[in-house]
Amino acid sequence: MAVNGVPLGTQDNLFCITGGEGTGKSNYVGAILAGALGNKRLPIEKTLGLEITANPKDLAVLHYDTEQSEAQLHKNLGKTLRRASLTAVPKFYHSLYLASLSRKDRLKLIRESMDLFHHKHGGIHLVVIDGIADLIRSANDETESIAIVDELYRLAGIYNTCIICVLHFVPNGIKLRGHIGSELQRKAAGILSIEKDDNPEYSVVKALKVRDGSPLDVPMMLFGWDKEEDMHVYRGEKSKEDKEKRKTDELIGVVKEAFRNSFKLTYQELCEVLMREMEIK
């Protein structure tokens, strides 16, 4: 997965999508899945601005959902197929409903089914876990958060695939919330945040982290509902002025965080806070 040639989600890695309720995360995930179902790359208009690597070898594409009802999952599947211009569910695509299982059993099923479908289809092209926080008891439990992110990172390496983790939290500026957010911030190769645009008819997608590059190299992308198409469609990129405003707003947020507990900082203390907040090593 890439935007304008900047890689976001790659093999052996985790890729995180985060955002609040009603921002269109599930529809965005559906667009990514649609791009992974065909043997030729879909145009970015179909995949809401993302460049998704096609799947000519029909490797397994796995979608685990902990959030939605079975009826909603089925409805979203229909939209994904329509977006991919398919009339039937490919044999290599498996969408699994996890909401009815206990949290412990959800991870067990993910582990076992990944192994099963890897052998059945000769490999795994893509995995999506919609609702990673629902695999543990609390998103603020440090031990559990470290364990689940480490385990998913391990599975991505074993099966040489990209695992997309969807986190249903609103980020705090450029930081993800909770211990699970902190772990994903450290381990994920890329993080995209989806939020409502100033124009409420649109959602805006922003890069919070890009391992091989800068988040500011990734344009802010827009998508919105189209009545005639009966699905979300790509609405292009935000302007250069909006990009500059975003940069300014994020820097203001970092400075506010730096001075949250003190009105005065030494130069060394300020450098340490800025390096920590902006993950500069």
What annotation goes with each model-predicted range?
Residues 44, 53-140, 226, 249:
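Conserved inter-motif catalytic segment of the P-loop NTP-binding fold
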Residues 16-17, 22, 27, 126, ...:
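Phosphate-binding/switch region of NTP-binding enzymes
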Residues 12, 57-59, 122-123, 159, ...:
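Structured loop/turn residues at beta-strand edges in well-structured enzyme cores
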Residues 1-80:
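The Walker A/P-loop phosphate-binding site
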Residues 31-32, 72-80, 109-113, 147-151, ...:
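Alpha-helical scaffold elements adjacent to nucleotide-binding pockets in ATP/GTP-utilizing enzyme cores
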